[in-house]
């Protein structure tokens, strides 16, 4: 089969646009794709919530990839061990109360489980602000969405209007 670059471009644009349009209104918007964001995305999506996670960097997982000083092992205590094992990450006891896990296995598993549960992950997007709606009573004032732009726009300090999503 001869490769058709236009079909590739069309596929990327259409599929991303479908995903983006589907996430203009979500139940939960998570800012940050580090370990906490990925775990939250998994548990919320697994319970049937419509979840979108936004990460400003190219890669998700935060600093977990690098473990300690780029030795790609992480150390967790009992609570972290339980979460990792619940998501399918192998842990090993080290000393009393300390457990280790492979940082690459942990990061990729958290990401895979979040996506598998239905969370949508948008990388290279920065959050510029939140959308707040006030009502007559101060108790009812709440955050209802996010103001989002491409990370490249932020880094280049370009004056480009952002887009919004509601949650």
Placement of each model-derived feature along the sequence:
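Conserved beta-strand-loop-beta-strand element in the redox core of flavoprotein oxidoreductases
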Residues: 131-166
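Conserved N-terminal glycine-rich FAD pyrophosphate-binding loop of Rossmann-like flavoproteins
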Residues: 4-6, 22, 57-80
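Short beta-strand to alpha-helix junction loop
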Residues: 72-76, 93-112, 122
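Glycine-rich Rossmann-fold phosphate-binding loop(s) that bind the pyrophosphate
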Residues: 32-36
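Conserved FAD-binding subdomain of flavin-dependent enzymes
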Residues: 43, 59, 72-94
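Extreme N-terminal leader/targeting segments of oxidoreductases
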Residues: 1-28, 113, 117, 130, ...
């Amino acid at each position: 089969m001869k490769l058709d670059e236009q079909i590739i471009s069309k596929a990327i644009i259409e599929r991303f646009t479908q995903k983006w349009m589907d996430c203009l209104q979500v139940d939960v918007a998570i800012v940050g794709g580090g370990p906490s964001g990925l775990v939250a995305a998994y548990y919320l999506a697994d319970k049937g919530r419509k979840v979108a996670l936004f990460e400003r960097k190219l890669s998700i997982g935060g600093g977990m990839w690098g473990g300690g000083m780029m030795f790609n092992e992480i150390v967790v205590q009992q609570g972290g061990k339980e979460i990792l094992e619940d998501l399918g990450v192998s842990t090993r006891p080290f000393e009393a109360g300390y457990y280790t896990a492979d940082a690459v296995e942990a990061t990729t598993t958290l990401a895979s489980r979040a996506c598998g549960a239905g969370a949508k992950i948008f990388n290279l997007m920065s959050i510029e602000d939140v959308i707040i709606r006030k009502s007559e009573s101060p108790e009812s004032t709440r955050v209802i969405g996010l103001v989002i732009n491409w990370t490249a726009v932020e880094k280049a300090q370009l004056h480009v209007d952002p887009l919004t999503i509601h949650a």
